[in-house]
C-alpha cells in the first residue's frame, strides 16, 4: 500500500479526504467483483433444494455495514435455520449442521466457476469463507442464528423481552444473541452518508496502526469505533458533507474522555416497555465506557478498559501532531461524551459545571467578538450618513444563560430612522442591507485579521443579518444576529417599568393587522434580558440544563414537527422556580423534574407576569384578558404582551411532552441512594386574581420536603 502504511500523523489535515480515497477505500472494480461473488454465495445458500433448513441469510461485519478497508477486511454471513425457533436454541452446538452446510456450499460454488476466488476453511464453531480478488480479501465468519425478526422490519418490545428471558434462562453472556439482529445492524448503517463511512475507514485504519505497536494489547471491536464515529457525527454535525479533520478531532477527543463515555440509541428499542427500561437503566449505570449496540440493548460493545486507556494516549499523540493541529482554532464538533439522560440527580450540578457552563476564557472570547462588531457598527457602518444608533446586546450571553457548546451573540441596533413599529416592519430590510454591504467592505480591509461568513436570508425582505466571525484573537467562530429595531422604550431608567402607552400602541397595531404576536419583541430586548439576567446563578444554571435537554429533544424531534421556541422553556423554568422554590440555593434535580412535569401538562399551562405591564390600564387589561382565554398553552412574554410563546396549537408541544414523559424514568430523577426525586408543587395556571410571579409562594403549600431542608440552610434569607 505504499504511503498508506505511513503514520497518519504525517498526513496534513486538508489531505485526509484524499488519503482515504487514495489508500483506504477498496478499488471499485475489486468491490464490484466481491459483491458479485457474495451475492452468488447468498443465492446458493437460499436454494431450497440444496439448503432446505436455511430460511434466510443476513450479511454483517464490516462488509455488511459497508465499512470495508482496502486489503484485508471482515464480514459475517448469518444463516437463519428453521430448526432454531427461539434464542436459547442457539446454545446448542451448531457445529454439525454448519459442517454439512460448508461442505455442500463448497461443492455448489465449484460448479458456479468461483473455485479460484474463494476458500472455505473449517473452524471450531463451523467454517469461514474467504472471498478475494487481486487487491481485496474479505473473510466471512459463517454463523447459525434464530431469525428473531422473521418477516418484521422492526423489532417489537416482545422480542427484547424474550431476549432477556432467554439470557437469564441459559446464563448466556449479554450480547451473545446479538447476531440474531444482524439485519438491523446493516440497516442502521445503510442510510449513513458516504463521507461518514469515509471517516469510519480513517478511524479504523488509525486503530489498526495503533494495534501494530503493541500486539499483546486486548483488541477493541472495530464495531465499537464505528458506533463511536456515528455518535460523534450525529451529535455534532449531521451534514452529508463535512470537514474530515473536524470529525477526526471529535472522535479522538471522545476517546480521550473514555472514562465518561456512555453512548446509546433508541432507534430499535426505548424506555416505554418496563423490561427494556430496566435493561437500559442497568446498562447505563455500568462502569464507563459504555457503548450499547443499537440493535441489542444487552450488548455493551465497548470491550476491555485497558485498550481504551492505551488508545487514549495514541489519540492525544495524533491530536497534538503538527498536521492535525495546524490551525488555530483547530475546529471540532461540540459533542458530550455522555448524554444527560444517564446522569444521576445528585450529579446534575457537576454535569452543568463540566459540560454546560462556559468558562471565563469562553466568555472573554465572546466579549471580544462583540466588541469588534459593536465598534464596527458605531464607528464604520454609518459614518457616511447622519444616522444615530444605540446598540443593545441580547441573547443567551447577555442573559447569563449561554451554553459551553455554541458561541452566539445578538445585537439589536436601535436606528433613529425607525420611528415606529410600522417603520420597523417596512424599513428594517434597508438597514440590514446597508450593514451587510458595509461589513463586507470592512472585512475586505481587515482580511488578514478577520473572516466573515454570511448566512443567506430567510425572508425576501430580511429582518436580521446573520453571520459568523473568525479572528486571530478568537479561539473559535462566533455566530451573530444583528437586528435593526425601533426604540419603543426610549431612555428607560434602570428599575422603572414602561408606560402603558408603549404597550397600547403595540396592542392597537397587533389587533388591526395580521402580524403574528411577538413580531416586535426585539424592541423590548432590554426587558427580556433584564428579566433573566437578574436571577440567581443556580437558576440560570437550571435554565442551561433545560436548554441542553431541549437541544437533545430538538435533534430527535425536528423532522417530526415544529417545536416551541427555547424562550418558552426558559420562561417555564423561571415560573417553576418562582412558584416552587424561590430560594437561590435549591435542588437542581427537583427543579429539572418540575419543568418536565409542567411540559407534560402543557394543555393546562397559562402563565404570565406583571413586572412590565399589568391590569391597571384599560387597553392593556382587556388585551391581557383576551390573551389569557386563548388555547393552552399560554406563556406570555414578560417583556411584551402580544408575544405568546406558548402558542396554543401553533407548535408541537405534544412531541415535547411525550419526550418529557419518557425522561421522567431517567436516573436524573433518582438521588444518590436510588430514591425518586419529587418535583416542586407548582400550579399549571394563573388567573388575573392570582398573586403573579413577584410574590413568593406560601412555603407550607409549595415546598417539597427536600426544599425545606435547603430552605432551613438558608434561614437567614428574608422572604
From Swiss-Prot:
CDD domains reported for this sequence: NT_2-5OAS_ClassI-CCAase
GO annotation, biological process: antiviral innate immune response; defense response to bacterium; defense response to virus; interleukin-27-mediated signaling pathway; negative regulation of viral genome replication; nucleobase-containing compound metabolic process; positive regulation of interferon-beta production; positive regulation of tumor necrosis factor production
Record organism: Homo sapiens
Region feature OAS domain 2, mapped onto this chain: 343-683
Residue pairs linked by disulfide bridges in the UniProt entry: none
Pfam families in the cross-refs: NTP_transf_2 (PF01909), OAS1_C (PF10421)
PROSITE patterns: 25A_SYNTH_1 (PS00832), 25A_SYNTH_2 (PS00833), 25A_SYNTH_3 (PS50152)
Quaternary structure (record): Homodimer.
SUPFAM superfamilies the UniProt entry points to: Nucleotidyltransferase, PAP/OAS1 substrate-binding domain
GO cellular component assignments: cytoplasm; cytosol; intracellular membrane-bounded organelle; membrane; nucleoplasm; perinuclear region of cytoplasm
Identification of the protein by name: 2'-5'-oligoadenylate synthase 2
This enzyme's EC code(s): 2.7.7.84
The family this protein is said to belong to: Belongs to the 2-5A synthase family.
Binding positions for ATP per the UniProt entry: 396, 544, 547
